[in-house]
Swiss-Prot record:
Zn(2+) binds at C18, C21, C40, C43. Keywords: ATP-binding, Chaperone, Metal-binding, Nucleotide-binding, Zinc. Pfam families: AAA_2 (PF07724), ClpB_D2-small (PF10431), zf-C4_ClpX (PF06689). InterPro entries: AAA+_ATPase, ATP-dep_Clp_protease_ClpX, ATPase_AAA_core, Clp_ATPase_C, Clp_protease_ATP-bd_su_ClpX, ClpX_bact, P-loop_NTPase, Znf_CppX_C4. Component of the ClpX-ClpP complex. Forms a hexameric ring that, in the presence of ATP, binds to fourteen ClpP subunits assembled into a disk-like structure with a central cavity, resembling the structure of eukaryotic proteasomes. One of its GO terms (biological process) is cell division. This is ATP-dependent Clp protease ATP-binding subunit ClpX. Belongs to the ClpX chaperone family. GO terms for molecular function: ATP binding; ATP hydrolysis activity; ATP-dependent protein folding chaperone; protein dimerization activity; unfolded protein binding; zinc ion binding. ATP binds at P122, T123, G124, C125, G126, K127, T128, Y129. One of its GO terms (cellular component) is HslUV protease complex. PANTHER family: ATP-DEPENDENT CLP PROTEASE ATP-BINDING SUBUNIT CLPX-LIKE, MITOCHONDRIAL (PTHR48102:SF7), ATP-DEPENDENT CLP PROTEASE ATP-BINDING SUBUNIT CLPX-LIKE, MITOCHONDRIAL-RELATED (PTHR48102).
Length: 425
């Protein structure tokens, strides 16, 4: 309960006082009542300032505030299946980035350059999820931008400075906190140069966006409207320094594996030419040989690649990895649907061969882990529709035939479970 200060007069016996500073209810704007004590709005603000300062100093001064690469990878393992090499590269890069910030605040002797990260891997292999999990581990503001919506300033579409605005919003407009955040730019392969030949038509959503991103990725002071919206001359702007913001770019780069394979082949003709067998390796295996020059051939400008010195490639997920994704992580899909069914007091059970069939379907769709949820929704749609109106159902069993569509899920009722219990006794 809060008491709003009234007039200065009144009975002194009924006057309430702040238990911390001793001011009366007439001297402050608000007085908040607890069971036996009172606190005024001024003391609340003072406490908040002290807490902010403590958090800031511990974040900057304590080396323990930066998780070790082993700590980071341990948490990533709980949420993301496989991709060991990519996780190792990311954990070291993120650890070094925040260690660099702590070092910079202690002395200005050696200036350590920022190491932005490029994630390359097939669709649905966990690029976005890795970046989101990293931000959660470090506990810094995080925002995600879609490169396909970005255009050069002055054209229809989003300016690159809108990315910084989103980060500022994620930090509740705390500029200092936003300046230590992480930005993930997805679908960065879609802003590749449209062609090698210069054209009379300006490429405002391809090379133009790459050029616009250069400055904010390297470090500049961006002017951001305080509460969003369009810029106008009379408006005051918030100044956000992007020097210490970590940028992670990700993309599927469809066809990049062919560029890498072509680089490795020797071009020879005639009777003495070496006949090379078809490259049957999976996309992820080919991507391991990625070099910056391959990204230039794909259509990214050298200056843009230069701002992303850390290259991490992710592998396409095989059947076993998809089964693990379904059942093992903390927030695995199977666990999510089992929790949904628990709300109806029903146990949801999947046979091992059912999980394998779901994984096979996802591989056929070529959507990676992203396609698993839509497959699960299709399998369980009728069951989730009927279940709230059915009485006595205690368990739903999903078999391989159910996943294939040749059978309906098995419903086990309460009386059948009692029969099972009696039989086992």
């Amino acid at each position: 309960m809060s008491k709003v200060s009234g007039s200065n007069g009144g009975d002194s016996k009924n006057t309430l006082y702040c238990s911390f500073c001793g001011k009366s209810q007439h001297e402050v704007r608000k007085l908040i009542a607890g069971p036996t004590v009172f606190i005024c709005d001024e003391c609340v603000e003072l406490c908040m300032d002290i807490i902010r300062e403590e958090n800031k100093s511990s974040m900057v001064k304590s080396r323990d505030g930066v998780p070790t690469p082993q700590d980071i990878i341990k948490v990533l393992d709980e949420y993301v299946i496989g991709q060991r090499q990519a996780k190792k590269i990311l954990s070291v890069a993120v650890h070094n980035h925040y260690k660099r910030l702590a070092h910079a605040s202690k002395n200005g002797e050696v200036e350590l350059a920022k190491s932005n990260i490029m994630l390359v891997g097939p669709t649905g292999c966990g690029k976005t999820y890795l970046a989101q999990t990293l931000a959660r581990i470090i506990d810094v503001p995080f925002t995600m931008a879609d490169a396909t919506t970005l255009t050069e300033a002055g054209y229809v579409g989003e300016d690159v400075e809108n990315i910084i605005l989103k980060l500022l919003q994620a930090a509740d407009y705390n500029v200092e906190r936003a300046q230590r955040g992480i930005v993930y730019i997805d679908e960065v392969d879609k802003i590749s140069r449209k062609s090698d030949n210069p054209s009379i038509t300006r490429d405002v959503s391809g090379e133009g966006v790459q050029q616009a991103l250069l400055k904010i990725m390297e470090g500049t002071v961006a002017s951001v409207p305080p509460q969003g919206g369009r810029k106008h001359p009379q408006q005051e702007f918030l100044q956000v320094d992007t020097t210490n913001i970590l940028f992670i770019c990700g993309g599927a780069f469809a066809g990049l594996d062919k560029i890498i394979s072509a680089r490795g082949e020797k071009t020879s003709i005639g009777f003495g030419a070496t006949v090379k067998a078809q490259d049957d390796r999976r996309v992820g295996e080919v991507l391991r040989e990625l070099e910056p020059e391959d990204l230039v051939k794909f259509g990214l400008i050298p200056e843009f690649i230069g701002r992303l010195p850390v290259l991490a490639t992710l592998e396409d997920l095989d059947e076993d990895a998809l089964i693990q994704i379904l059942s093992e992580p903390k927030n695995a899909l199977i666990k999510q649907y089992q929790r949904l069914f628990e709300m109806e007091d029903v146990e949801l059970t999947f046979h091992e061969d059912a999980l394998r069939e779901i994984a096979r379907k996802a591989i056929v769709r070529k959507t990676g882990a992203r396609g698993l949820r839509s497959i699960m929704e299709k399998i369980l749609l009728d069951t989730m529709f009927e279940l709230p109106t059915l009485e006595g159902v205690r368990e739903v069993v999903i078999s391989e035939e159910v996943v294939r569509g040749s059978a309906r899920p098995l419903y086990i009722y309460a009386d059948r479970q009692e029969e099972k219990a009696n039989a086992s006794a």
